[in-house]
């Protein structure tokens, strides 16, 4: 399935939750979700009854879109989580958080995950001193993610770093802002994820 190319503000309205897909704009009074927090379309303001399957599907779509994955990518991530030890739903969220593009967003080197994914592909970052251009690469404890020397004056990176205070830094990451680098001190745990997510609904959906 192709990646969504339409207005990302419609996604937040569809999922009835601000997913922070447009970076700094989501914190401003220009945010479309704050102005129209009902689903898009002609009948968006109508109340409709939704089935159990529909609830599960919406939860899957919400998390998939928040992290910017295609259906195939999301399903593969779920299968890896299902085969690993532990709770499948928690494993899924931890694996999504450990993606390199997400870590770069969390560190404040990008305004949103979409921007982070693009910058990874353009070789703006190194992991443990080596160039990595795969957004889905999984970081590990002790990994150092650094902005390459020639990229430290790129406007989108410097602007994003100025705005990171609004989001806050997760406890499992450490940021050395002066040297444009971050360190993975631990793996994220469920309590680190404050966005409303019901991962068990996704497990139920894929178990059918």
Curated annotation (Swiss-Prot):
The keyword Ribonucleoprotein applies. One of its GO terms (cellular component) is small ribosomal subunit. GO terms for biological process: ribosomal small subunit biogenesis; translation. InterPro entries: Ribosomal_uS4, Ribosomal_uS4_bac-type, Ribosomal_uS4_N, S4_RNA-bd, S4_RNA-bd_sf. Gene3D superfamilies: Ribosomal Protein S4 Delta 41, Chain A, domain 1, RNA-binding S4 domain. Keywords: Ribonucleoprotein, Ribosomal protein, RNA-binding, rRNA-binding. SMART domains: Ribosomal_S4 (SM01390), S4 (SM00363). SUPFAM superfamilies: Alpha-L RNA-binding motif. CDD domains: S4. The keyword RNA-binding applies. One of its GO terms (molecular function) is rRNA binding. Pfam families: Ribosomal_S4, S4. Residues 98-159 form the S4 RNA-binding domain. One of the primary rRNA binding proteins, it binds directly to 16S rRNA where it nucleates assembly of the body of the 30S subunit. With S5 and S12 plays an important role in translational accuracy. Belongs to the universal ribosomal protein uS4 family. Part of the 30S ribosomal subunit. Contacts protein S5. The interaction surface between S4 and S5 is involved in control of translational fidelity. This is Small ribosomal subunit protein uS4. It comes from Desulfatibacillum aliphaticivorans. The lineage of its organism: Bacteria, Pseudomonadati, Thermodesulfobacteriota, Desulfobacteria, Desulfobacterales.
């Amino acid at each position: 399935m192709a990646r969504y190319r339409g207005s990302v503000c419609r996604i937040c309205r569809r999922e009835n939750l601000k997913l922070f897909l447009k970076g700094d704009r989501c914190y401003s009074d220009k945010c479309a979700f704050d102005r129209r927090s009902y689903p898009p379309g002609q009948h968006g303001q109508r109340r409709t009854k939704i089935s159990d399957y529909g609830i599960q599907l919406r939860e899957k779509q919400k998390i998939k879109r928040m992290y910017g994955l295609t259906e195939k990518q999301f399903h593969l991530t779920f299968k890896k989580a299902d085969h690993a030890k532990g709770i499948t739903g928690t494993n899924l969220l931890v694996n999504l958080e450990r993606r390199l593009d997400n870590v770069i967003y969390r560190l404040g080197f990008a305004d949103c995950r979409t921007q982070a994914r693009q910058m990874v592909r353009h070789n703006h970052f190194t992991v443990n001193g080596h160039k990595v251009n795969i957004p889905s690469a999984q970081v590990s404890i002790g990994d150092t993610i650094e902005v390459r020397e020639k990229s430290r004056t790129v406007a989108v990176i410097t602007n994003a770093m100025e705005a990171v205070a609004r989001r806050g830094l997760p406890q499992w990451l450490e940021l050395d802002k002066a040297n444009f680098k971050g360190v993975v001190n631990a793996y994220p745990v469920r309590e680190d994820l404050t966005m409303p997510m019901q991962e068990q609904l996704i497990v139920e959906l894929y178990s059918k």
